[in-house]
């Protein structure tokens, strides 16, 4: 950690096709082993599949899916005395987006469709309709925070 000044957030370049920073971030989350062009192909193919199935604006569906997966609270471990408590904390907006994208991609990777593009499209469509594994993950995190509400005074 630097001692002199706080390091600012890096500016992310928008994606070349839709000029969206959100999509560029999503491409970076999907990317494995530095293969960005492969990640871009997967995302753009998934968006094409969504456009075929729904006919609506595919970026709106992506935004709706992320909205339904974004957590508002999470639990963090806090050691007090000899025991560890799961303390519910509010999630900052940047982390909220990052978690939503990560959970969507994880859920898509566990699906059964043939290609990653189809899996991702299916998971995004499910999430936009408030169902699917990623939404279930968010519900589990919220349930955990609700169950541990008694330890909220240990927040830092």
Curated annotation (Swiss-Prot):
A single cellular component GO annotation: cytosolic small ribosomal subunit
Record-linked InterPro entries: Ribosomal_uS7 (IPR000235), Ribosomal_uS7_bac/org-type (IPR005717), Ribosomal_uS7_CS (IPR020606), Ribosomal_uS7_dom (IPR023798), Ribosomal_uS7_dom_sf (IPR036823)
Membrane-spanning ranges: none
One Pfam assignment: Ribosomal_S7
Alphabetized Gene3D superfamilies for the sequence: Ribosomal protein S7 domain
GO molecular function: mRNA binding; rRNA binding; structural constituent of ribosome; tRNA binding
Subunit: Part of the 30S ribosomal subunit. Contacts proteins S9 and S11.
Family named by the database record: Belongs to the universal ribosomal protein uS7 family.
Annotated protein name in UniProt: Small ribosomal subunit protein uS7
Protein's organism: Shewanella oneidensis (strain ATCC 700550 / JCM 31522 / CIP 106686 / LMG 19005 / NCIMB 14063 / MR-1)
């Amino acid at each position: 950690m630097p001692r002199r000044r706080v390091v600012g957030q890096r500016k992310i370049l928008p994606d070349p096709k839709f000029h969206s920073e959100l999509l560029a971030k999503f491409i970076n989350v999907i990317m494995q082993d530095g293969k960005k062009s492969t990640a871009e192909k997967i995302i753009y193919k998934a968006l094409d599949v969504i456009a075929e199935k729904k006919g609506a604006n595919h970026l709106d569906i992506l935004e709706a899916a992320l909205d339904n997966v974004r957590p508002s609270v999470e639990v963090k471990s806090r050691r007090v005395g000899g025991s560890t408590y799961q303390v519910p904390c509010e999630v900052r907006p940047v982390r909220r987006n990052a978690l939503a994208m990560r959970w969507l991609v994880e859920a898509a990777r566990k699906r059964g469709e043939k290609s990653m593009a189809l899996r991702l499209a299916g998971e995004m469509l499910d999430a936009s309709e408030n169902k699917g594994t990623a939404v279930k993950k968010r519900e589990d995190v919220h349930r955990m925070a609700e169950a541990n509400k008694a330890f909220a005074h240990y927040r830092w």
